[in-house]
Design a protein with these regions (language model features):
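Mid-domain catalytic core of redox enzymes
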Residues: 240-371
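Active-site-proximal substrate-binding core of FAD-dependent oxidoreductases
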Residues: 244, 492-530
Length: 535
């Protein structure tokens, strides 16, 4: 029995079905997909969440399909400019002098155009040659580290890692902001090892993309393939609690009780909710060791976001997404370190931050069928606190701050908007079914990654975890897919099943990786800085 049809639950269901394990997936909502679900309105097909996929078919989302022999079942699409940094043009900037209201810095898909991005970004943040050299050393070092060097930074922060390389606040601000999109946490709270692991793989794969059909194409495809293999998938079926055998010395799962009181028997149950929700509400703390309960209570989730879905009658953006951070007097291009910290401190106080960071994928630029002909769909979000934080600024104020920010970087937005659907934190919390509504239920902080991350198994026999709650590494949905694979493997081992051999890496891929590593050695030797020794 798998509870929840998000990426983690859908992946686990498919892999167990492929292994011949009878499996039922239950989803409380009437549509599959969790935060990757979709709704339709006036010819637009709209994501519930706000998504792009860092490694596309090259990463865990594709690995799930390759494990079941369906590697090409989802079509991940890229655009010429995969993203674009946008800021209001400052009076002294070249964009302002050229008469433009917005400074645009394209992020290309083609690696050959990356030097142009570096040049434009360096000019935009007024880098001196010394500062540019420091930034180059930082990124060269990151890309040429060994896996062992990366793992040594698991339990220290990204702030500690960056400090020996540069103190240039705009460089730190933009790098920290982009990694903040990965983890929905400030960079001084993020595990350096986790951030480096994710950034290196994203850079080397160069597969940031979006699936044809929308985000729902991923869980929908997993579930369709699982059903073809005999799995049962039920929607509109909520789980009230997970049931245990009576009188067992060690807790053992016996099934679930649904919201309508129906009991479904199962000797294995996979929860894709948060560890906190699973322990305290679905099972009950009395059934777990005290130390495990305390750990579940202490788990730190990520922040969440307010969202808006904007339907336009005209195409206003050509890139695959736009990102940035905008304030009244300051933005990410001219911040100080204090500005960056105050941005997140305000969020923890329940106040709209002085700089509003935004992230806005444009799904219809990847798949034109997601909007009527000639139209465009924007899905924008801005960071917000989880529901356990008392709001000093009411929810609608957060939503309006997000919209005000987007209007400043998308000229003509209001004139061409057909409708704008706003999603509050409360809505997202109810939809995904995780207490407080964190985007990542076990946040990737130094004490919650690597060896210190909760495992996919629990002290109760037959109870497992999958999704962004336990196990694995990665960004968002890719973390969930990797966790799903880890969970399925653990279940099969515990059931005494043989794990199927992994498909070996193709010789050309291995040769390319080896050649890339060799080519990087001279550059690494010449440019790498020596950060503080990990103790």
């Amino acid at each position: 029995m798998v509870i929840g049809s998000g990426i983690g639950g859908a992946a686990t269901t498919l892999l167990l079905a492929h292994a011949g394990v009878p499996v039922t997936l239950v989803e409380k909502n009437r549509r599959l997909g969790g935060s990757c679900s979709q709704y339709e309105k006036r010819g637009f097909r709209i994501d519930i969440g706000t998504h792009m996929f860092c490694r596309g078919a090259s990463g865990p989302l594709g690995d799930v399909l390759r494990r079941v022999g369906k590697g090409g079942a989802i079509d991940f699409v890229r655009t010429r400019d995969i993203s674009e940094l946008r800021f209001p043009a400052r009076r002294s900037s070249s964009a302002s002098r050229a008469g433009a209201d917005v400074l645009r810095i394209p992020v290309p898909s083609d690696l050959a155009r990356m030097p142009q991005l570096a040049w434009q970004l360096a000019r935009a943040i007024d880098m001196t040659p010394r500062e540019a050299t420091q930034a180059a050393r930082l990124f060269t070092y990151i890309l040429t580290m060994s896996d062992e060097e990366v793992a040594a930074w698991d339990h220290r922060t990204l702030e500690e890692f960056v400090a020996p390389f540069t103190d240039h606040a705009p460089t730190i601000g933009i790098f920290g902001f982009l990694l903040g999109l990965y983890f929905i946490l400030p960079y001084w709270e993020v595990s350096a090892g986790e951030a480096l692991w994710c950034f290196r793989r994203m850079a080397k794969d160069n597969s940031l993309s979006y699936p044809r059909g929308g985000s729902i194409a991923i869980p929908e495809t997993y579930c369709r393939l699982a059903k073809e293999l005999g799995a049962e998938v039920r929607v509109g079926v909520g789980v009230r609690r997970i049931l245990l055998e009576d009188g067992a010395e060690v807790g053992r799962v016996r099934g679930v009780e649904l919201a309508d009181g129906t009991v479904l028997a199962a000797n294995v149950v996979v929860s894709t909710s948060s560890l906190r929700t699973t322990v305290l509400h679905l099972v009950g703390p009395q059934h777990f060791p005290a130390a495990y309960v305390e750990r579940a209570k202490r788990i730190r989730g990520s922040y969440i976001a307010v969202q808006a879905k904007i339907a336009l009658d005209k195409k206003l953006i050509s890139a695959g997404s736009i990102v940035g951070g905008v304030g009244e007097e300051v933005d990410l291009l001219n911040v100080t370190t204090s500005d960056i910290k105050e941005m997140f401190n305000a969020v923890t106080r329940g106040e709209v931050p002085p700089i509003v960071p935004f992230y806005c994928p444009v799904p219809s630029n990847f798949d034109e069928t997601l909007a009527p002909p000639g139209h465009q769909l924007l899905t924008v979000c801005a960071v917000a606190p989880t529901s356990d934080v008392a709001l000093r600024d009411p929810g609608p104020v957060w939503e309006e701050a997000m919209m005000r920010t987007v209007r400043r970087v998308v000229p003509g937005l209001d004139e061409h908007a057909l409708f704008i659907d706003r999603f509050s934190v409360d809505f997202i919390e109810k939809w995904i079914g995780k207490e407080f509504g964190p985007a990542v239920s076990t946040g990737q902080t130094p004490d919650q990654v690597g060896a210190r991350r909760p495992p996919v198994y629990t002290p109760i026999r037959g109870l497992y975890l999958a999704g962004c709650n336990a196990g694995a590494r990665g960004v968002g949905t890719e973390l969930a897919a990797a966790s799903g694979m880890e969970c399925a493997d653990r279940i099969l081992v515990d059931l005494g099943r043989e794990l199927r051999a992994r498909e070996p890496a193709r010789l050309r891929v291995r040769a390319g990786q080896w050649a890339s590593r060799v080519a990087q050695v001279p550059l690494a030797w010449a440019t790498r800085a020596r950060p503080a020794v990990v103790g």
